[in-house]
Regions:
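An active-site-proximal structural segment forming one wall of the substrate-binding cleft
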Residues: 1-24, 59
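Glycan-recognition surfaces
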Residues: 1-2, 6, 46-144
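Active-site-proximal loop/short-helix segments
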Residues: 17-46, 74-84
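Short, polar/charged, Gly/Pro-enriched helix-capping and turn/loop motifs at alpha-helix termini
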Residues: 18, 66, 166-169
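Charged, low-complexity, helix-prone segments enriched in Lys/Glu/Asp/Gln
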Residues: 44-51, 82-86, 152-166
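Glycan-recognition and catalytic regions of carbohydrate-active enzymes
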Residues: 117, 139-180
Length: 180
């Protein structure tokens, strides 16, 4: 861990990097289980998570103005401790142009985690608005039928207009039920 911290910190300093994004796009559970001793199930995962927190703490101490973008690995790294250190600008790998799923993520996360984002794939109002949150990745294809550059510009302007409201109080239009 000490070597990694020093190496990455020096690399970032030498190259003027002030925004760090972490993603690993694998399911590590099987690797963790294989590394565990029979009577110590879960210890490798615990050590990994403790190491992750220590690594990010080192980066934030060395670079106090650094932004850590926690690509949440399919939502698996959205926990209290990572939220203290980072923002998930890509909150989940569930992003395959399915607007109802986007709305469910936004609805639930906005109660606890105001900074998060996902991708916008289409410029029609329903799909695009379903993707909006405090951050959004425009994943448009200029060559896709039914999408024009003008429509893309309109979406971006609409997003710029409403984005400040994502940092205000959150009152969903549907019931919240019991959050405990």
């Amino acid at each position: 861990l000490k070597w990694l911290c020093q190496y990455m910190g020096d690399f970032m300093e030498q190259n003027g990097i002030d925004h760090y994004r972490q993603d690993f796009n694998i399911d590590p559970l099987e690797f963790w289980h294989q590394a565990d001793e029979a009577n110590r199930r879960g210890i490798t995962e615990v050590k990994y998570i403790e190491g992750l927190y220590a690594y990010w703490d080192y980066l934030l101490q060395r670079f106090p103005n650094m932004i850590i973008d926690n690509c949440a690995s399919g939502g698996r790294r959205l926990d209290y401790e990572t939220s203290l250190r980072s923002a998930p600008l890509w909150r989940t790998d569930y992003q395959y142009s399915e607007p109802m799923g986007y709305q469910c993520h936004t609805y639930g996360l906005n109660f606890f985690l105001p900074q998060h984002g996902t991708g916008a794939y289409y410029v029609d109002r329903f799909d695009f608005r379903s993707s909006m949150s405090s951050a959004v990745v425009f994943n448009w294809k200029f060559t896709q039928t039914g999408q024009s550059f003008l429509d893309m510009q309109k979406c971006i302007e609409e997003y710029k207009e409403v984005r400040p409201y994502y940092y205000e109080d959150y009152y969903p239009l549907s019931g919240i039920g019991n959050l405990t």
